[in-house]
């Protein structure tokens, strides 16, 4: 059997059984590299509880943003607009039948916004696209970057709710019933769709070439999930 786990780049290690998730035969091994990102999207969904009729705005069409749109699209009657300044992402959005634009239309207002761009400065722009009591769910990690946010304007008058969806803990809306290991199994099961292979880099990077790869990271600007070959000669 093949298993999925989160672990730093090493060729050999010992883990407890509870740190592993068995990969079902229906899901290709390489596609399971999207598991952590799918868990992020699941947790954000649990944090915000979207439903039929919601108007959704997703900022950032990287892997997390696309997976967020992908699982939200399964909800009947939901409207989703995916935003990314990189027009090359339009092709990927079309593949998943997701409405795409490079800029937020001036009149567009959403009741749930998912910020997946990694750029905290976009938060101020979102103030022009909220309804009363809109929830802004931040999936990005900003590190130690500092950004000024104008909380005293639309965010205040429209009682906006801003939450950070941190994937290390299961959302409080589901923590009574779900453990991290359960959520991981759910994420893997949701990867049973061949279309998701389009998010993964076709070429693999040899484990021993990683230092060279990261030293030239600026040359590798595509958003695809990278695949590392640890030298195990198996067909994945």
Stretches found by the model and what they are:
Residues 178-236:
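C-terminal hydrophobic helical "lid"/dimerization subdomain
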Residues 1-22:
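Glycine-rich phosphate/adenylate-binding loop and adjacent beta-alpha elements
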Residues 28-102:
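Mid-domain Rossmann-like dinucleotide-binding core that forms the NAD(H)/NADP(H) cofactor-binding site
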Residues 1-3, 43, 55, 135:
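Residue-level marker of beta-strand positions
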Residues 53, 109-111, 197:
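Local beta-strand N-terminus motif with an aromatic residue
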Residues 91, 96-163:
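Glycine-rich cofactor phosphate-binding loops and adjacent beta1-alpha1 units
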Residues 149-201:
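C-terminal substrate-binding/catalytic core of Rossmann-like NAD(P)-dependent dehydrogenases/reductases
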Residues 57, 61, 82-83, 111-115, ...:
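Glycine- and other small-residue-rich loops at beta-strand/loop junctions that grip anionic moieties
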């Amino acid at each position: 059997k093949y298993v999925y786990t989160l672990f730093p780049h090493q060729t050999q290690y010992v883990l407890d059984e509870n740190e592993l998730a068995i990969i079902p035969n229906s899901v290709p091994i390489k596609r399971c590299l999207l598991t952590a990102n799918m868990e992020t999207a699941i947790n954000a969904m649990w944090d915000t509880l979207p439903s039929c009729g919601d108007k959704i705005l997703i900022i950032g069409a990287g892997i997390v943003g696309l997976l967020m749109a992908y699982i939200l699209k399964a909800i009947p009657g939901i409207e989703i607009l995916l935003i990314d300044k990189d027009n090359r992402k339009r092709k990927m959005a079309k593949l998943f039948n997701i409405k795409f634009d490079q800029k937020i239309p001036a009149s567009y207002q959403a009741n749930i916004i998912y910020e997946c761009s990694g750029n905290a400065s976009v938060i101020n722009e979102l103030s022009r696209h909220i309804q009363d009591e809109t929830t802004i769910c931040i999936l990005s990690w900003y590190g130690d970057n500092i950004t000024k946010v104008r909380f005293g304007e639309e965010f205040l008058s429209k009682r906006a709710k801003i939450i950070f969806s941190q994937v290390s803990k299961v959302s409080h809306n589901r923590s009574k019933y779900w453990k991290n290991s359960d959520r991981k199994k759910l994420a893997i099961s949701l990867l049973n769709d061949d279309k998701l292979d389009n998010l993964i880099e076709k070429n693999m990077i040899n484990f021993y070439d990683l230092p060279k790869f990261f030293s030239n990271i600026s040359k590798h600007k595509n958003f695809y999930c990278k695949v590392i070959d640890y030298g195990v000669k198996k067909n994945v």
